[in-house]
Amino acid sequence: MTAFLPFLAFLFGLIIAGLPLLWYIRQQKTALDGLQARVLEGAKAEEQARRIPALEQAVESWREKASLLMAEQAANKRGEEEREKAYRQQIEQLKATEDALSQKFDSLAAKTLEKAHGQFLEQAQMRFAKSEREGEAKLELLLQPVKDSLKRYEASVKEAEQLRQTEYGSLTALVSTMREGQEAVKNEANKLVNALRTAPKARGCWGEQQLRNVLESCGLSEYVDFETEVSVNSEKGRLRPDAIIRIPNGSILVVDSKVSLNAYQDAYDAVDEDKRQLYLQAHSKAIKAHIDGLSQKNYWDQFKEAPDYVIMFIPGEHFLSAALEQDHNLWEYAFQKRVLLATPTNLIAIARTVAAVWRQEDIAHNARKIGELGKELYERIAKVDAHMRALGNSLENSVKNYNKFVGSFESRVLVTARKFRELNIETKEQEIKEAPILEITPRMEDKE
């Protein structure tokens, strides 16, 4: 409005200055009308003066005056036309100035709005970009432990898979080894028997070695899963079982190897069936004697972690089967003496059960570890979610402040600016458009 005050003052002064000019023009027009009336009267008088020579000179004088008046009137008329033309030019200049000022104001208002809108969008984009960069940095920092946890979890899974494949390969190799070993045993049995018959100490060492081989073939490690020749003192003297197998719950299994070979070999070499039966009976009695001797050692009293029985390892299926043929109650007799008879087949089953329990213990440990990692991962994801929600609230507040600015600009600035159109100011159909309102809730695309 301040820019229009000089224009209004100029217009008002022009109107004040034009009032005398209009009055003067009106007076000249009145005089001209009177002059025309007098000319008409003079013409009438001239008609009458034709008859009167004396009046001719007066008529001529009036004519001269009329000519002068008409010339003056023509001059006044030309001056009036020039003044009117100048006045119209001034009016046109005023209108052009008014149009230029209106266009300049509209352009200035549009540029101001566009500049303010652009500056706000630029600042908003800068803030959004900064918030996005900070959010990405924070998110990357927060997700780094998650990545590390996932890498550790992936490494654990790969290790478990490799362990499974290794165990499967070990089992396959073990079966192949057992098959080859059985063939080798058949070929070397006679040589071994002859060597063992002549050296009792060698028989004991052979039985202990067979026991160690069976345990190790099942995946148990010496000094970790089992120990050999562990000595304890008792009332009956120094006791030394051949092996102690450790179980994950803290218990132990006591295993002692017993080899009864002489009577069995005599029966195998006997040609007469009666003698063969006698030797087999002697072999069965020797097995029973080993059971009695092992029962009397009371290993369950010396090892508090051991159950109330001891395992008697016989390093050969045929040794036990030959004794059972002569005494069918041998299993029950040994059980009553708290002795469990075990051949390589039975002991393999026991050892594999123990190894499986150890593996289950490892799996349970890994499962607990995975559970802890999962809990840690969940807590960190919850923190990430909280930060994401805080970032969303910040963006929502920025959009709300922008909408408040647009609403204030629309209701307090543009409303006043649009009133110029009500004053019939030429704006050449230029209209100030409304600033857009941003949506607070982002539109999400539907995903099938």
Curated annotation (Swiss-Prot):
Pfam families linked: RmuC
Top-level division of the source organism's lineage: Bacteria
Biological source species: Zymomonas mobilis subsp. mobilis (strain ATCC 31821 / ZM4 / CP4)
InterPro entries reported in the protein's UniProt record: DNA_recombination_RmuC
GO BP field: DNA recombination
Coiled coil spans: 43-167
Swiss-Prot/TrEMBL keywords: Coiled coil, DNA recombination
Name this protein carries in UniProt: DNA recombination protein RmuC homolog
Similarity-based family: Belongs to the RmuC family.
Function summary: Involved in DNA recombination.
